[in-house]
């Protein structure tokens, strides 16, 4: 089957689309990436998403309209990846669309029950591309008592399980998440959970203090020094003390967190603040490894992926934090995979599993009561 996986994450960089060919289903799936592209959001669309994400500034009329606008954006992104690959849209069998997360409530709080909302109307995508769309991957896991995240572990087992090596896959997108993948000869369980901020705080600080979308290659962070006072404040965040399985998002580490941090520590240089929040991402990752993984698993390899793996300063901070451990640290590209395409490929794989009616959540990662088939299916017009 030819499937387009579509992902728009918490970083708001744009729409990632992976065109893949998948043979079979389940753990024996054969997956080949044909082409990958990122379609940036228009400035007006990005502004509307940012407004929709704000509890103070959002409204139901905006979210209702944006749901359909993003459906068109996602459909156009699928057309773009096919055009770039010189691949006929009519050959496409399936689209797996994650959607744009507007709010994620992983656990009950007050009178709010656990819930999640991703928008980007699948009916619009299906109609505009004349292709079956699978979307809303998180909701069934949450209906089964899970947190709806992380969802990539299933695809990571298919792609990265090694005959003899125990691996950690660390994704560094807007949020960081880790998947523990025991070797094929191991009888230990796959586990996964969010490790805290990935690029989210780094990018927000860059935009506010340097008027740059992100810290390219970590060049600015390399110039500053870590401020212990700020790092201690960050590392005391309640999320870091929670036991897995757990998930987080912009609600905990987004604009409000950055606003409070910058107001509290405005006396420090902007370079030192950026260096410190970069160290916070690295330290939160290392903290979770040492607290929740390394005491129980003998890890041979750590594989870093996502946009954060291109931040050389961040990667070196992670390496330094793990210098006393026996594991070898790689970037996805070191082993022949694409850091950028990883999550989009994951949702193509999940769409394939749903098409074949196979459960594809990992209860040990999400906390769900049972394995369930993920996603809603939307057929194109006849």
From Swiss-Prot:
Q: Cross-referenced SUPFAM superfamilies, in alphabetical order?
A: Actin-like ATPase domain
Record carries keyword Kinase: yes
Identify which top EC class this enzyme belongs to. Answer: transferase
Keywords from the UniProt entry: ATP-binding, Carbohydrate metabolism, Kinase, Nucleotide-binding, Transferase
From what superkingdom does this record's organism come? Bacteria
| Pathway(s) the chain acts in | Amino-sugar metabolism; 1,6-anhydro-N-acetylmuramate degradation; Cell wall biogenesis; peptidoglycan recycling
Q: What does this protein do?
A: Catalyzes the specific phosphorylation of 1,6-anhydro-N-acetylmuramic acid (anhMurNAc) with the simultaneous cleavage of the 1,6-anhydro ring, generating MurNAc-6-P. Is required for the utilization of anhMurNAc either imported from the medium or derived from its own cell wall murein, and thus plays a role in cell wall recycling.
Q: Which NCBIfam families match?
A: PRK09585.2-1, PRK09585.3-2
Put simply, this protein is called: Anhydro-N-acetylmuramic acid kinase
Q: Which gene encodes it?
A: anmK
């Amino acid at each position: 089957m030819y499937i387009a996986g579509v992902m728009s994450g918490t970083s708001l960089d744009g729409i990632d689309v992976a065109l893949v060919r998948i043979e079979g289903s389940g753990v024996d799936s054969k997956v080949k990436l044909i082409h990958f592209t990122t379609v940036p959001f228009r400035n007006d669309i990005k502004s509307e998403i940012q407004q929709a994400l704000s509890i103070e500034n959002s409204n139901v009329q905006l979210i209702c309209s944006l749901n359909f606008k993003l459906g068109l954006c996602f459909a156009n992104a699928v057309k773009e990846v096919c055009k770039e690959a010189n691949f006929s849209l009519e050959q496409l069998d399936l689209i797996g669309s994650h959607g744009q997360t507007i709010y994620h409530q992983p656990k009950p709080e007050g009178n709010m029950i656990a819930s999640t909302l991703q928008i980007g109307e699948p009916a619009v995508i299906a109609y505009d591309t004349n292709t079956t769309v699978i979307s809303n991957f998180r909701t069934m896991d949450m209906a089964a008592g899970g947190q709806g995240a992380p969802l990539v572990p299933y695809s990571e087992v298919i792609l990265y399980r090694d005959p003899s090596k125990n691996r950690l896959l660390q994704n560094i997108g807007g949020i960081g998440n880790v998947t523990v993948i025991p070797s094929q000869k191991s009888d230990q369980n796959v586990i996964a959970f969010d490790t805290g901020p990935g690029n989210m705080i780094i990018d927000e600080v860059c935009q506010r203090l340097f008027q740059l979308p992100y810290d390219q290659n970590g060049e600015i962070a390399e110039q500053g020094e870590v401020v212990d006072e700020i790092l201690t404040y960050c590392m005391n965040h309640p999320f870091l003390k929670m036991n897995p399985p757990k998930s987080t998002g912009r609600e905990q580490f987004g604009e409000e967190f950055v606003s409070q941090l910058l107001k509290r520590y405005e006396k420090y240089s902007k370079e030192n603040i950026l260096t410190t929040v970069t160290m916070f991402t690295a330290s939160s990752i290392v903290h979770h490894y040492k607290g929740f993984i390394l005491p129980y698993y003998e890890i041979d390899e750590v594989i870093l992926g996502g946009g954060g793996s291109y931040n050389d300063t961040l990667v070196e901070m992670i390496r330094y934090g793990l210098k006393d451990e026996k594991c070898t640290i790689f970037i996805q590209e070191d082993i022949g995979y694409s850091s950028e395409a990883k999550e989009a490929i994951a949702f193509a794989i999940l769409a394939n599993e749903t098409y074949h009616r196979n459960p594809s959540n990992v209860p040990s990662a999400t906390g769900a009561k049972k394995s369930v088939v993920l996603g809603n299916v939307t057929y194109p017009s006849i």
